[in-house]
């Protein structure tokens, strides 16, 4: 090869090498896409639309600070329309087509279960912001809502101790979260010495509207001379006619209190709260809690919505915490690469809105305070009980035989269902 040709070829190769290295660099300098996977229509829109909006607000705020790694964030919003198989399709669209770095989404456990195989197959990250049944610790999911030991179990303990409840109605929507939560609660109550005949379990479909017979059964069950309470895992817009029927049949909170796990400020906004006054909800956040951080968040939210009546709620705060943790993890990793961000997240801390600091744990759950709130006539809550500190989320319930020896640990064990007795991953 002559010298001239060698020089030309060398220059061409050098140019090609520079071009090859430039392409990823230019891709790295573009916006970072963030997926938002919440139902904007259908039965769950009453709860999920707000979560889409709070993510848009958080992304807008982060962009004002310069984005992440010097890159702007670009929200990608889809509507899975309360259709569980559609959640999986929309998740695939976000990850494979839109190339999002992470997704914030889902409310119901059936929607989360629907998307899990997609996030595992395509190796992407989901932040899930709603209380759920536990019995799960997935590498690709970070659970920023409550596990049963951060909501359901403390609520039952409160009712037994403070309200002297002896008979229990476990009422839920017919899907995995209420069924598993009630299985845990039934085992817990039986272990506490509650008789099986003092536990009534009932399930209704999504969007259920005719509560007359069920509420009549609850009233009858509560007339046996023992203090009775309803533990409600009823989800979505079915809550409105349920509480209305309680009022229609003259059931007051002083007679049969209801403690709800899926009724918050958003669900109470714009409905007649008279039938609900005095009933309870268990959450890890309430709008009514006075802290400088919460006051600032409420003010920011009302300004963003251009609505002085806009309310805040627990899953919104879970997105606030989860988003802050994701930003910190990306900055710590120096990249949006999912494997590196997943490894960076355990140990990351972010302030919650009620005065503490939440920490992401090796089981991909976080530490949270627990509050019991009493519904007021303005749709807000009076906090009547709270934990002294933050409660670490348990992925696996000690109340269930198949789970009590399991832990999730993605740092040391690299396993979501490690059996501490057999020292084996896989739960066996």
Feature map (PLM): residue ranges:
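N-terminal secretory signal peptides and thylakoid transit peptides that target proteins
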Residues: 1-14
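C-terminal segment of classical bacterial N-terminal signal peptides
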Residues: 17-25
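Extracytoplasmic "Venus flytrap"
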Residues: 35-54, 78-85, 107-110, 174-179, ...
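Beta-alpha junction/loop-to-helix N-cap segments that form part of ligand/metal-binding clefts
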Residues: 46-53, 65-135, 144, 203-212
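Extracellular/periplasmic Venus flytrap/periplasmic-binding protein
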Residues: 89, 133-134, 140-249, 288-296, ...
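Periplasmic-binding protein-like
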Residues: 94-106, 127-129, 169-172, 225-236, ...
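Extracellular/periplasmic periplasmic-binding protein-like sensory domains
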Residues: 245-320, 330-336, 386-422
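Solvent-exposed, acidic/polar segments of extracytosolic/periplasmic ligand-binding ectodomains
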Residues: 349-428
